[in-house]
């Protein structure tokens, strides 16, 4: 009975998140409506990045932001009341739902114009607060770089000079991206218990905006397979560090691996909250941190 109660809370959370996406473009980073999905239409574009990768249709209609604020606030109170008498085995899941319901509530209020401090925002959205630093430390680091970096000019100029030397020519880009993607893919298989079925298809093309790094298209997913294409922008200034960032961090063993594992968790548990990753949520913070850590380990 208790699991069905939590599933009810979780499904209401998902319903509200999807409705909020009407007012919060780009918020839905990943969504698995069921245990598998396959694109059945050729109505997609390799020219424009549209998130999510497939149309959620009527699921994003039915609630205003004011509705979402009121309902999420009520559900937060009910979740906290339920937590007081819940068994120990449910505590972690309840904490997850409370944190994510709070981020939904807070983000909806932001969209309605409510202001807050930076620390209040990160605490409510991501369950994180930036540590306090003595900023003189950064000046000390800058001074050490200034003394030791080769080249002429200030630190930023010398960094740019160095980056020019690791810029990848456009005619070499596809081979470099494929080789690096394959290397990260092998490391992920060896160290993260993956089937190896989700290596993305890599393409390069001139996208409309030179600041647009890539365009992603999802074609299908199931329990242990994500069929995925990534189009990298030939107009972007590609350097070695950017290739590492946008392959390992963004794909395997980073975000793509996380989405595969999360989809498996959704199917294994049947918990509705595992079906979705919102940009403005603690799950998003974990997505970014785990991708950084995993790609650095490779």
Predicted features along the sequence, with ranges:
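N-terminal maturation segment of proteins
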Residues: 1-298
């Amino acid at each position: 009975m208790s699991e069905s109660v939590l599933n009810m809370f979780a499904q209401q959370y998902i319903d509200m998140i999807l409705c909020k996406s009407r007012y919060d473009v780009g918020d839905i980073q990943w969504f698995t409506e069921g245990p598998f999905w396959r694109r059945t239409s050729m109505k997609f574009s390799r020219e424009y990045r549209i998130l999510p990768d497939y149309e959620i249709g009527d699921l994003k209609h039915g609630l205003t932001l004011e509705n979402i604020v009121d309902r999420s606030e009520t559900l937060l109170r009910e979740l906290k009341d339920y937590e007081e008498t819940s068994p120990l085995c449910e505590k972690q899941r309840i904490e997850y739902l409370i944190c994510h319901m709070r981020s939904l509530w807070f983000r909806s209020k932001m969209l309605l114009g409510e202001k807050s401090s930076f620390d209040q925002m990160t605490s409510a959205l991501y369950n994180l607060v930036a540590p306090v630093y003595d900023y003189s430390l950064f000046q000390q680091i800058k001074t050490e770089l200034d003394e030791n970096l080769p080249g002429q000019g200030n630190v930023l100029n010398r960094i740019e000079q160095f980056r020019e030397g690791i810029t990848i020519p456009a005619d070499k880009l596809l081979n470099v991206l494929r080789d690096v993607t394959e290397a990260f893919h092998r490391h992920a298989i060896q160290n993260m218990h993956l089937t190896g079925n989700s290596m993305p298809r890599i393409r390069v093309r001139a996208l409309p905006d030179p600041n647009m790094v890539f365009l992603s298209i999802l074609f299908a997913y199931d329990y242990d397979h994500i069929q995925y294409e990534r189009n990298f922008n030939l107009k972007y200034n590609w350097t070695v560090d950017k290739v590492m960032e946008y392959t390992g961090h963004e794909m395997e063993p980073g975000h793509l691996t996380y989405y595969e594992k999360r989809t498996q968790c959704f199917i294994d548990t049947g918990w509705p909250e595992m079906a979705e990753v919102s940009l403005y949520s603690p799950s998003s913070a974990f997505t970014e941190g785990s991708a950084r850590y995993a790609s650095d380990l490779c």
